[in-house]
Design a protein with these regions (language model features):
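ER/secretory pathway lumenal C-terminal domains and tails of membrane proteins involved
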Residues: 2, 109, 122, 138-143, ...
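N-terminal membrane topogenic signal
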Residues: 5-20, 115
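Alpha-helical transmembrane segments
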Residues: 15-28, 121-126, 351-352
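Alpha-helical transmembrane segments of multi-pass membrane proteins
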Residues: 26-36, 355-362
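Extracytoplasmic catalytic/substrate-binding loops of multi-pass membrane glycan-assembly enzymes
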Residues: 33-45, 55-67, 261-262, 434-438
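Loop-to-helix entry region of an early transmembrane alpha helix in multi-pass inner-membrane enzymes
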Residues: 61, 73-96, 100, 117, ...
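A residue-level signal for alpha-helical anchor/packing sites in multi-pass solute transporters
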Residues: 65, 101-104, 136, 157, ...
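Transmembrane-helix motifs of polytopic, lipid-linked glycan transferases
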Residues: 85-113, 125, 129, 153-157, ...
């Protein structure tokens, strides 16, 4: 009861068994580990670790420091695989703690040792093989696996505090928890999620702890100490690393005392930590109803136990999810009956990482949710299941307790242990990233599509991260200047563009099609303006009448309306960079049409090249057949897509679609030129890409 210790307080937790569980889970992840980067944020975070840089706000400084140190270990793995291994170890650590927690709960219930270990093993396996947990643990796509490890350590400390006699020494575990909460916030703001559960559990056992000034001071001090990695951000930002998103510093020309401790640095750091640039609505300003938001969580919960990506087994997926949900809820009830002390922590924690987190994140409809509603509802740009991996991993604890309780009542309840094996078998092909090199190959393919010293304007950051990875981690084409069009609305990307070093082109490492020519290294940045001049560019300017845009190389037409800051910079880029630097746009960019430049555009592989003279009519750009065919032959992406097989993430389908569209266009052009044999080769390779990515319906092909 409150104010007392639990029976069995002197028992040492089964750390050896927890370690074995950690090793077993880690082996599963190592067998299915990604050999390199992946789509979405993985490339950004791996690159940030490599160059000791700053990823997108809030900057995740503790992750960067941990990953950078881990990446220096002399392991027989590529740099990316080492960072992926860090994700695997982190998730596996949480699995070991869940084993200890389950064993402890069942010991309180008087469950026999063998049965305890079987149920704990099943619960750990179930949580570890949940689709999102598994898929995120074999590549460092986010920082959430390190957060999961910290949640596990906090849980272990909390369990020990609840089980031990009251003493100042025992209370030091609360101080350690406060330190981990602060440090967890430096990994990701979600690091605070266990906080409410800790407070409730402490209040349950002995609310008088909140009246002890010394303990409160130690806890507060430890929490603040845990936040100190944020000091890394302005210090490192001032040194201008290759990856410096948000640039949270007032220092423009190197680290100095005066600019570091300035109002400008404070404001930029605060904006970075608070993610001000994303302008996320208040939690009180609901983007959609709470019901559909819970529906999104339920969709992702169903995915965990059988990731039926093509909808072939919807009924089986639903039944399995209902069983896992029901057994878990029953396990929560059994937990409450058997062990109120740990339940006082674990139940609030589970509520926080499920219901409360759903409400707080305030997402729009999920990318895959309610497809029948189409574009009639606001949607996230991708499925956000990764935000809930903590609840999916931890759900295995209550499922294990539920199985133990049912097994005690019914001998047949032992059969529920089979639940633990179903996700392992059903999710293997979907969760494994063992042969996935698509993101690395795609980034390198785009970079190798452009001429030396080119400038390439990309549409979004997620499309650009693989290019950053290729440049910063693998040294592919650092001579290319990569510009994200949306970032040009902010000052720091423009400043970095103006001050970026110009790397020499390495013809030996570059594509064969660019060899045998002399490429002159540019002498100035792609944008030829001062920092002050760039800061004076307005957020937008109104165009009342059609305007002719002329540079030394091209002539376009700007229609009436509003030019945003990014548009102004792109026009200035065309003026300043050409003809010294070739300019490219990624496929799908709206700028050629927006500025009336279609007749200057020539498709070369995966990119559009802005030529200095017209190469087509005003209806659209032309295709450089010879160069595109040469690029197609050197591209690694199509083979990687076929090798990967099932394309689970439909939100990133643009990647295989870009290859497929190029292949279709190229094969048709080769046919028109009478090169039917070469056309058939490209067409067959394109069809293989379409089928591997499951795009038959999109491209009008019958399913096999």
């Amino acid at each position: 009861m409150p104010g007392s210790t639990s029976a069995g307080a002197s028992r040492t937790p089964p750390l050896a068994w927890g370690a074995l569980a950690t090793i077993a889970v880690c082996l599963l992840y190592v067998v299915t580990l990604a050999p390199t980067t992946a789509l979405w944020d993985a490339s950004e975070y791996i690159a940030a670790a490599r160059v000791l840089g700053l990823p997108h706000p809030p900057g995740n400084p503790l992750f960067v420091l941990i990953a950078h140190a881990f990446g220096t270990l002399p392991l027989p793995l590529s740099y990316a695989a080492r960072i992926n291994l860090l994700a695997a170890l982190s998730s596996a650590t949480a699995g070991g703690v869940w084993f200890i927690l389950i064993d402890d709960i069942l010991l309180k219930a008087g469950v026999a040792t063998v049965r305890r270990r079987l149920c704990a093993s099943g619960g750990v396996l179930l949580g570890a093989s949940a689709f999102t947990v598994w898929n995120q643990s074999v590549v460092n796509e986010k920082v959430y696996t390190i957060s999961l490890a910290l949640f596990g350590l906090i849980t272990l400390l909390m369990l020990q505090w609840l089980r031990s006699e009251s003493s100042p020494r025992n209370d030091m575990r609360l101080v350690a928890i406060a330190l981990l909460l602060g440090a967890g916030y430096c990994v990701h703001p979600a690091g605070l999620l266990p906080g409410p559960a800790v407070v409730i559990a402490v209040a349950y056992r002995d609310w008088r702890r909140f009246l002890q000034p010394r303990l409160i001071a130690l806890v507060a001090g430890a929490f603040v100490l845990g936040l100190t990695p944020f000091a890394f951000e302005p210090i490192r930002a001032a040194q201008q690393p290759a990856l410096n998103e948000g640039a949270p510093t007032g220092c423009e020309h190197g680290l100095a005392w005066s600019c570091t401790f300035s109002e400008k640095t404070y404001q930029r750091l605060a904006d970075n930590v608070n993610r001000t640039q994303y302008a996320k609505p208040s939690v009180m300003d609901r983007q959609i109803g709470f019901g559909p938001q819970l529906g999104m969580w339920w969709l992702y919960f169903k995915w965990q136990w059988l990731r039926d990506s093509h909808g072939r087994h919807p009924f089986g997926q639903l039944v399995l999810a209902l069983v896992v949900l029901g057994v878990g809820l029953y396990g929560g009830y059994a937990h409450w009956r058997w062990d109120r002390a740990s339940w006082a922590y674990w139940a609030p924690f589970m509520f926080t990482v499920t219901v409360l987190l759903v409400y707080y994140m305030n997402f729009k409809y999920g990318f895959s949710q309610a497809p029948e509603l189409g574009s009639a509802v606001p949607r996230e740009v991708r499925d956000r299941d990764y935000f809930f991996l903590w609840s999916f991993s931890a759900w295995g604890v209550w499922v294990a307790v539920g199985i133990a309780s049912l097994w005690r009542r019914f001998t047949a309840g032992a059969g529920l242990l089979a639940l633990a094996v179903i996700p392992l078998a059903g999710n293997w092909s979907a969760a494994s990233r063992r042969d996935d090199t698509v993101a690395r190959d795609w980034g390198a393919d785009i970079l190798d599509s452009v001429e030396p010293y080119a400038v390439i304007v990309t549409m979004g950051d997620n499309d650009t991260f693989p290019l950053w990875y290729a440049q910063m981690v693998e040294g592919v084409r650092p001579d290319v200047t990569v510009i994200i069009e949306g970032y040009l609305d902010m000052d720091w990307p423009v400043h970095q563009l103006l001050e970026a070093p110009i790397h020499s082109y390495d013809s030996e490492r570059g594509p064969a099609i660019y060899r045998g020519r002399t490429w002159v290294r540019p002498t100035r940045p792609a944008l030829n303006m001062s920092l002050a001049e760039s800061d004076s560019v307005p957020d937008y300017t109104e165009i009342r009448e059609p305007q002719i845009f002329r540079s030394a190389a091209v002539e376009g037409r700007v229609q009436p309306g509003y030019l945003e800051r990014k548009d102004i910079f792109v026009l200035r880029l065309i003026t300043d960079a050409m003809p010294q630097r070739p300019i490219y746009f990624t496929a799908g960019s709206s700028y050629p049409a927006q500025f009336g430049l279609q007749r200057y555009m020539r498709t070369e592989g995966l990119v559009q090249h802005l030529m200095p003279t017209p190469v087509g009519d005003s209806s659209g750009e032309s295709l450089d057949v010879d160069r595109s065919e040469a690029l197609w032959r050197q591209y690694h992406g199509p083979a990687a897509i076929v090798r990967r097989g099932e394309w689970i993430d439909r939100a990133s389908l643009v990647v295989p679609a870009d290859y497929a569209l190029l292949g279709i266009r190229l094969s048709d052009a080769l046919d028109r030129d009478g090169k039917h044999g070469r056309a058939n080769v490209v067409r067959d390779e394109t069809i293989a890409v379409i089928r591997a990515a499951g795009m038959e319906e999109l491209f009008g092909l019958p399913r096999k």
